[in-house]
């Protein structure tokens, strides 16, 4: 088998530009991000996520993010049928960490912005200023229909109008502690939130449609996007370029943070064998549900996160970019990511989170030029 990661052929940028941020996408739902009967099967718990984030902090990860999922895909694996709640989980994790940045996700159809503003200010206090909010509009209709709060299918074409008003209320309340915002979706009447966050609250998003990127260009501190393909670490470059161009139109610097799964082992062949094993156990019933739901939004264009998730090419891990190889191969591929214009960080998942973070910290990260600035490890973590 050929080396999964070809030798780098580019000239690395200067050291400052190569200081790429790394985060962990914690498994708030059962089984993480592998829709396979052959993958590790586990329930989400606070203790599991605590161990993951504390390991990530020990190995100098920069941030941890949790999603929000309100209904799963079913199938033999009951994929994502079992989920914790994002804000309460991250509040708990904020209390048991000291350096790593913590981000929770707000499903904006379920939570009024004034409540999110107050919850965020509370976790800012718990964390000592290490908290931020990921805003999502909602794409999986059954999540909201089951609670009677789906606003109708025209929401697909208006969701970023809704989110624009939402974030304006948040900015009012975090900035001055007061909002009198009047819009089509929200009406504030001397709405108050105090105490306010101790530092400016970071807002992040994950838009790949034109509307999503335009929103991020105006309001987000950075924007998540999917990596693409297997061992094609720079295939997301056109998406990062679109985000960079959108941000230039608003005069802001909004970097792209790219989602990848790492499947690593001592050799390329051993890592590839794991990947093929996971694919062979794909939960077809759960994948069919994902495909069906991804087709409900016909108004956001073809280049969206949801469309990519359902692509049959690598649906077993929701088509996030996948880096499969030896520790050295994965390190080289991540250095390639760092060289893409507009790429400022990566958000990583693992086939096995606890062992994956440990091997990443011990065997992969020390080989990465874009992480050469990190201090040496000083202690063991349980």
Swiss-Prot record:
<protein>
    <recommendedName>
        <fullName>Pyrimidine monooxygenase RutA</fullName>
        <ecNumber>1.14.99.46</ecNumber>
    </recommendedName>
</protein>
<comment type="function">
    <text>The FMN-N(5)-oxide reacts spontaneously with NADH to produce FMN. Requires the flavin reductase RutF to regenerate FMN in vivo.</text>
</comment>
<feature type="binding site">
    <location>
        <position position="209"/>
    </location>
    <ligand>
        <name>FMN</name>
    </ligand>
</feature>
<keyword id="KW-0521">NADP</keyword>
<dbReference type="InterPro" id="IPR050172">
    <property type="entry name" value="SsuD_RutA_monooxygenase"/>
</dbReference>
<dbReference type="GO" id="GO:0046306">
    <property type="term" value="P:alkanesulfonate catabolic process"/>
</dbReference>
<feature type="binding site">
    <location>
        <position position="134"/>
    </location>
    <ligand>
        <name>FMN</name>
    </ligand>
</feature>
<dbReference type="InterPro" id="IPR036661">
    <property type="entry name" value="Luciferase-like_sf"/>
</dbReference>
<keyword id="KW-0285">Flavoprotein</keyword>
<feature type="binding site">
    <location>
        <begin position="68"/>
        <end position="69"/>
    </location>
    <ligand>
        <name>FMN</name>
    </ligand>
</feature>
<feature type="binding site">
    <location>
        <position position="143"/>
    </location>
    <ligand>
        <name>FMN</name>
    </ligand>
</feature>
<dbReference type="Pfam" id="PF00296">
    <property type="entry name" value="Bac_luciferase"/>
</dbReference>
<keyword id="KW-0503">Monooxygenase</keyword>
<comment type="similarity">
    <text>Belongs to the NtaA/SnaA/DszA monooxygenase family. RutA subfamily.</text>
</comment>
<dbReference type="GO" id="GO:0019740">
    <property type="term" value="P:nitrogen utilization"/>
</dbReference>
<dbReference type="GO" id="GO:0052614">
    <property type="term" value="F:uracil oxygenase activity"/>
</dbReference>
<dbReference type="GO" id="GO:0006212">
    <property type="term" value="P:uracil catabolic process"/>
</dbReference>
<keyword id="KW-0288">FMN</keyword>
<keyword id="KW-0560">Oxidoreductase</keyword>
<dbReference type="InterPro" id="IPR019914">
    <property type="entry name" value="Pyrimidine_monooxygenase_RutA"/>
</dbReference>
<dbReference type="InterPro" id="IPR011251">
    <property type="entry name" value="Luciferase-like_dom"/>
</dbReference>
<dbReference type="GO" id="GO:0008726">
    <property type="term" value="F:alkanesulfonate monooxygenase activity"/>
</dbReference>
<feature type="binding site">
    <location>
        <begin position="159"/>
        <end position="160"/>
    </location>
    <ligand>
        <name>FMN</name>
    </ligand>
</feature>
């Amino acid at each position: 088998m050929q080396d999964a990661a070809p030798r780098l052929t580019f000239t690395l940028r200067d050291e400052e530009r190569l200081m790429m941020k790394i985060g962990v996408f914690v498994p708030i739902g059962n089984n993480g991000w592998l829709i396979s009967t052959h993958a590790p099967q586990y329930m989400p718990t606070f203790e599991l996520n605590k161990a993951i984030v504390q390991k990530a902090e020990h190995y100098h990860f920069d941030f941890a993010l949790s999603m929000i999922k309100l209904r799963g895909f079913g199938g033999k694996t009951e994929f994502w049928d079992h989920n914790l709640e994002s804000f309460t989980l991250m509040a708990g994790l904020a209390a048991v960490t000291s350096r790593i940045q913590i981000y929770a996700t707000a499903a904006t159809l379920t939570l009024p912005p004034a409540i999110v503003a107050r919850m965020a200010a509370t976790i800012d206090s718990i964390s000592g200023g290490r908290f931020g909010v990921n805003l999502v509009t909602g794409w999986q209709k059954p999540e909201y229909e089951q609670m009677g709060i789906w606003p109708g299918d025209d929401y697909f074409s208006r969701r970023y109008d809704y989110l624009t008003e939402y974030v304006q209320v948040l900015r009012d309340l975090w900035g001055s502690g007061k909002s009198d915002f009047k819009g089509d979706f929200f009406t504030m009447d001397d709405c108050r939130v105090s105490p306010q966050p101790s530092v400016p609250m970071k807002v992040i998003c994950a838009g790949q449609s034109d509307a999503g990127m335009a929103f991020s260009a105006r309001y987000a501190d950075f924007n998540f996007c999917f990596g693409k393909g297997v061992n094609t670490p720079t295939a997301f470059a056109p998406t990062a370029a679109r985000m960079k161009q959108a941000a230039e139109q608003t005069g802001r610097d909004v970097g792209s943070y790219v989602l990848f799964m790492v499947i690593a082992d001592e050799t390329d062949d051993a890592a590839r064998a794991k990947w093929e094993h996971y694919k062979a156990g794909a939960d077809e019933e759960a994948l069919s549900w994902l495909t069906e739901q991804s087709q409900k939004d016909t108004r956001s264009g073809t280049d969206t996160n949801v469309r990519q998730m359902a692509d049959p090419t690598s649906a077993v891990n929701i088509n996030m970019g996948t880096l499969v190889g030896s520790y050295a191969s994965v390190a080289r591929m991540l250095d390639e990511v760092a060289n893409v214009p507009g790429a400022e960080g990566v958000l990583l998942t693992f086939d096995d989170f606890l062992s994956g973070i440990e091997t990443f910290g011990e065997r992969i990260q020390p080989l990465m030029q874009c992480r050469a600035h990190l201090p040496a490890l000083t202690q063991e973590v349980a």
